[in-house]
Structures are given as C-alpha cells and as structure tokens.
Swiss-Prot record:
GO terms for molecular function: rRNA binding; structural constituent of ribosome. GO terms for biological process: cytoplasmic translation. Keywords: Ribonucleoprotein, Ribosomal protein, RNA-binding, rRNA-binding. It comes from Rickettsia akari (strain Hartford). Belongs to the universal ribosomal protein uL6 family. This is Large ribosomal subunit protein uL6. Gene3D superfamilies: Ribosomal protein L6, alpha-beta domain. HAMAP family: Ribosomal_uL6_B. It holds the Pfam family Ribosomal_L6. One of its GO terms (cellular component) is ribosome. Part of the 50S ribosomal subunit. This protein binds to the 23S rRNA, and is important in its secondary structure. It is located near the subunit interface in the base of the L7/L12 stalk, and near the tRNA binding site of the peptidyltransferase center. It comes from the Bacteria.
C-alpha cells in the first residue's frame, strides 16, 4: 500500500482539472499544464479531489501509483503558486546576466557560456552571483537548473562553481607539504 499514492489531491479554488482517460490537464492563475500518464493506474475526480488508484497489484503499477500522485500534486501547486529555485555562483570573476532570451554566464572559461532560456521559465538575476528561476513545471525547472549547474559544478577544494542556494558542498583539504 503506497502511503503517498492513497492520499487524495485536494483541488484549490481557481484551479480547474480536465481528465481524459490518462491525460490530466490542470489550469490555474499561473498557467496550464498537461501530462499523459502510462501504466496500470486509474485517475478519477470526485468532490473536488483527485484520486489515483492502481489497476493491478504488480510492482510497476504500485510504483507508478505514488509517482503519478506526486506529479499531479506538483502540477496543482505549480499552476496555483508556482515554483522557485535559487542558484548561487561562487568564484572570483564568476557572474551571470540575462541578455534578451539568453542567460550569459562568465565562469573563468576562454569564452562566455550562453544558455537559451525556455519560454516557460522566468529568470531574475538580482546580483551578479545569484540566479532565481521561476516556473510552473517543477520537473522542467529542475532540469534547466541542472543544465546551468553543469556549466561549472561546485568543486570541493575552494568551493567555486554554481550550486543550489541551500546545498552543502563537503570541503576537502588541499595538498600537505
């Protein structure tokens, strides 16, 4: 029995849900999201609550049960409130700026790195070393953040690189002479 999957998803005011077999369309004040689910699950809407149930008792159906419930819950939160991620850049001369539809990163390379900003993500750079990402889709927001972090991942010796705001980087000692 999935502890996550058996919980109903309450639909808040201002959010509408459309069901078409395994396709879920959710719209709210921040935008609209839709997703088609695969697997042995059934999604039903009753009394302003969404319920996800497995159709079989096998392992893959139970795994998809909790996963589908979490994804739908994140979709509801995304269209109602949205998601926000904060990235921090550490290092001498490392900085970020937004130019048009590109994020321009200066990360001590021989060239500046340009990353195209997806249409569903808003980026704010209040300081040169802080990037704030906002969007309705939690999965796509995390994927875009990982693309940015991949440009210069944090290293354990001096702590230079791009990391999530609350991420802890374990530090190592340098060479001993």
């Amino acid at each position: 029995m999935s502890r996550v999957g058996k919980l109903p998803i309450t639909i808040p005011e201002g959010v509408t849900v459309g069901l078409n077999d395994l396709e879920v369309k959710i719209s709210g004040p921040k935008g609209e999201l839709s997703k088609i689910f695969k697997g042995n699950i059934a999604i039903s809407l009753a009394e302003n609550k969404l319920l996800v149930k497995p159709l079989a008792a096998n392992k893959s159906a139970r795994a998809m049960w909790g996963t589908a419930r979490s994804i739908i819950s994140n979709m509801v939160i995304g269209v109602k409130e949205g998601f926000k991620l904060k990235l921090e850049i550490n290092g001498v001369g490392y900085r970020a700026m937004v130019k048009g539809k590109y994020l321009n990163l200066m990360l001590a390379k021989s060239h500046n790195t340009k990353i195209e900003i997806p249409s569903h993500i808003k980026i704010d750079v209040p300081k040169q070393n802080i990037i704030i990402l906002e969007g309705t889709d939690k999965e796509k927001l995390g994927q875009f953040a990982s693309i940015i972090i991949k440009q210069r991942p944090p290293e354990p010796y001096k702590g230079k690189g791009i990391k999530f705001d609350n991420q802890f980087i374990p530090r190592k000692e340098g060479k001993k002479n």
